[in-house]
């Protein structure tokens, strides 16, 4: 991007704890090299075909093409074939980090490039990142820095959407109100913003962000989200077999109110990562519903998972790391009555 006759460097944004992250490597209790099949970018795969010696022979014997035609490392016993007995990567040890695939180098980072800026989220499915997120009860803030990469022109209404997200984050962190009231206002603002997007008035999002104020809401009688939302989650693609068991136990266990300060940080984590992705398809409300569903589900699963951190880790691993599951939920918010917006409002108002 060129401003004032000068090329603009890339602006990066991330949570305030981003630079404190350190991989636990072999000490990680839930290694990212198990349970997920590693898909290789083409450049890395071609480089692996040229590696000499015993490691090169193993690489060439292991690499296969998956159903989509992508190169991958099929799991062996649920583990990457290059994960050794100390839970360390043989490729990293022998060739260095730069020789690992893009997927392996970037994990646990979710990286979203919006042209004018880039945003990076440390996945809460990673134990080290999870601990950083939940290791403070302070309001979650976000830092920024520039690098030498050049930015590109942004979508015309990304600026308004970014301002709207800032307003939505400020709602979530307004501790003068109970968390459920904040989540209600968060959804109400998303609902009104969605009406503008549906009318192709994205340029008005900034004005809405500046002028919006809390509104009264009549919930009415009827069902809330639970236990039906847990059953919908159980219909999705599953990574670990006991996930559905945990969801069923969540149905049977009396819900308990969680720590609002920590759940607020969870809400901000999801809002930061997901809301701006509406620039790609216009579905802001669905992503706001995803954020609220995540908070309420994690809170509900905390007793059966043995703690908030583990409940969040499992939700992120099963849902947030599956594009198929995320897309299925966005579709369900539009089509499934048990996940309708009114059910969200009833759950928040009556629970």
Question: Which sequence ranges carry the predicted segments?
Answer:
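Local cysteine-cluster metal-coordination motifs and their immediate loop/turn environment
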Residues: 20-38, 74-110, 123-131
